[in-house]
Amino acid sequence: MIIRSPEPEVKILVDRDPVKTSFEEWAKPGHFSRTIAKGPDTTTWIWNLHADAHDFDSHTSDLEEISRKVFSAHFGQLSIIFLWLSGMYFHGARFSNYEAWLSDPTHIGPSAQVVWPIVGQEILNGDVGGGFRGIQITSGFFQIWRASGITNELQLYCTAIGALIFAALMLFAGWFHYHKAAPKLAWFQDVESMLNHHLAGLLGLGSLSWAGHQVHVSLPINQFLNAGVDPKEIPLPHEFILNRDLLAQLYPSFAEGATPFFTLNWSKYAEFLTFRGGLDPVTGGLWLTDIAHHHLAIAILFLIAGHMYRTNWGIGHGLKDILEAHKGPFTGQGHKGLYEILTTSWHAQLSLNLAMLGSLTIVVAHHMYSMPPYPYLATDYGTQLSLFTHHMWIGGFLIVGAAAHAAIFMVRDYDPTTRYNDLLDRVLRHRDAIISHLNWACIFLGFHSFGLYIHNDTMSALGRPQDMFSDTAIQLQPVFAQWIQNTHALAPGATAPGATASTSLTWGGGDLVAVGGKVALLPIPLGTADFLVHHIHAFTIHVTVLILLKGVLFARSSRLIPDKANLGFRFPCDGPGRGGTCQVSAWDHVFLGLFWMYNAISVVIFHFSWKMQSDVWGSISDQGVVTHITGGNFAQSSITINGWLRDFLWAQASQVIQSYGSSLSAYGLFFLGAHFVWAFSLMFLFSGRGYWQELIESIVWAHNKLKVAPATQPRALSIVQGRAVGVTHYLLGGIATTWAFFLARIIAVG
């Protein structure tokens, strides 16, 4: 008798050839919807086509099919990202002054775009130094390339080609995993396995390989660059990787190889894995040895985290158990049922991810200037301002997106019959208390924060400076913020005994880092002016949250419309005969939330731009005297509304308004054009649908008279469509106006 070990059961996780590849179907607009596929009767058709093309919920109710479409779309997204990156690297290789910038980053500006002379627009090619004429870029790519050890344009070409290959690969993967081997629903819902791969694979091994690259390639190359060695003389990356003696000349402990690691004598590696804090005085960036150490530590943490969850072997945590154990004395059933929500509603899952990623993006914005990670980034003021502004906007949009998808989850995926007394149910049951308290907080913050400014404007207008809230009259010092600053400034040698400097120069301590006569960073003083504007931040953020949270908590029902869930995520009003029920859909809350998000982020980036020009950025003389760009006027000017208008908006707009005839003139045109786009939005936002329908009908009459009427009937935009077009142009116009204003200013004076 032969005893066989039991055959392992192989779980089949994919379906083969589930959907045939049909070019005929792809070529047919609206193939995903019976109604839209019929073709246009009226012009509303094109709007519905765009609104529903990616609303996979509306194509089918089969969760597996929806999951596959989302998964496939992700590969398409990655393909576009690789294509974009490839373009950036190609521009660096083909059209840029990267090699010149590398040899003298303090006197030469980064440029990767040279305008062709067609109608005289070669005026835009400004002199960026070193005899190169082009458009100055503010994306920070040059600084990243230097930090990663790229020393010539051939390397950029190779990376660009590599990214193109990856883009093609991603496109193929998107097709393959929808049409050839599509994962089953069980695969999408296997969260423990997903966590293992994402934590240990993406974040763990990703960080480890980046740390390895930094140690073996970036550090030695940057060491040579910092010492002033000509980039052409520096050995190439593969020489450092293959030849240990080369590295040992720079870092002697390399000669010992892995012995110190296995004998636990890790301090030997302290040459290239440091814990210094502060900035490298040569480049004004974080110490690259600190960054390598950081990525190694992060890699270890995530590799451990990736092994915490129970998959094929019966050990480790189960997500469902963790969530169901999560309850306290006041939280009823706690998170019971949350596991089922997050594995069956991708909107709920996406909502959490957007909220966290949005918050993280805003954290990134604040770290990019306070702990500038790349060499010569801190002294490139245009790039610093651009990176801060960009990450703030992106974070704001992601957080509004979180509320949007939370509301879609509530309308489409929430099942009240199966939820009782878990945390979500308890939040919904006392939503009135939450919203009314939040509303009170908004009113309090609004009146008090704005009231402080109005007081100051009034006192200033009446010529009574001694009665103003300011650092020289009635002081309102931000004592808690100053306490946090001091705690961090004193950390080295106290709470962080191993560090030689604090995490950021902004905390205080008197250090100043200047590179090539320009200030990289110095301690940022906070005073009454910051106290005032921070309360405006609190106000705008709370109002944004009020609108978005109300939209989520009242997405399914309200006293006004008890059956709101039946009307869907977006609807204009609750039908005829019910006046006063317009603008109550969850979609309308997202619409309104976007405007307040725009308010909130605008105040933040204005605060940052002016504060940095006034108190941080500037030049330093040989005697060590710092001259700031706006001479420290923030503390006294920004404490009145009039000061913001006069000394920030008007005074700093002079560069963009006077840019005609110079290399910055494109910003002047954009400033004008984007104002126009913004104003155009008001035509959609302050208009009634009937007005346009009447107008359209008389225009159609004229076309009929001339026998040129189209077969597709023109229709005025629906209320929701009009609002969507309006808010899009409002945000686009506002953001582009700000962009032109900031860049013309900072490129001219920075």
Swiss-Prot record:
InterPro entries: PSI_PsaA, PSI_PsaA/B, PSI_PsaA/B_CS, PSI_PsaA/B_sf. GO terms for molecular function: 4 iron, 4 sulfur cluster binding; chlorophyll binding; electron transfer activity; magnesium ion binding; oxidoreductase activity. Phylloquinone binds at residue 692. Coiled coil: none annotated. P700 is a chlorophyll a/chlorophyll a' dimer, A0 is one or more chlorophyll a, A1 is one or both phylloquinones and FX is a shared 4Fe-4S iron-sulfur center. [4Fe-4S] cluster binds at residues 573, 582. Chlorophyll a' binds at residue 675. It catalyses: reduced [plastocyanin] + hnu + oxidized [2Fe-2S]-[ferredoxin] = oxidized [plastocyanin] + reduced [2Fe-2S]-[ferredoxin]. GO terms for biological process: photosynthesis. HAMAP family: PSI_PsaA. The PsaA/B heterodimer binds the P700 chlorophyll special pair and subsequent electron acceptors. PSI consists of a core antenna complex that captures photons, and an electron transfer chain that converts photonic excitation into a charge separation. The eukaryotic PSI reaction center is composed of at least 11 subunits. PsaA and PsaB bind P700, the primary electron donor of photosystem I (PSI), as well as the electron acceptors A0, A1 and FX. PSI is a plastocyanin-ferredoxin oxidoreductase, converting photonic excitation into a charge separation, which transfers an electron from the donor P700 chlorophyll pair to the spectroscopically characterized acceptors A0, A1, FX, FA and FB in turn. Oxidized P700 is reduced on the lumenal side of the thylakoid membrane by plastocyanin. This is Photosystem I P700 chlorophyll a apoprotein A1.
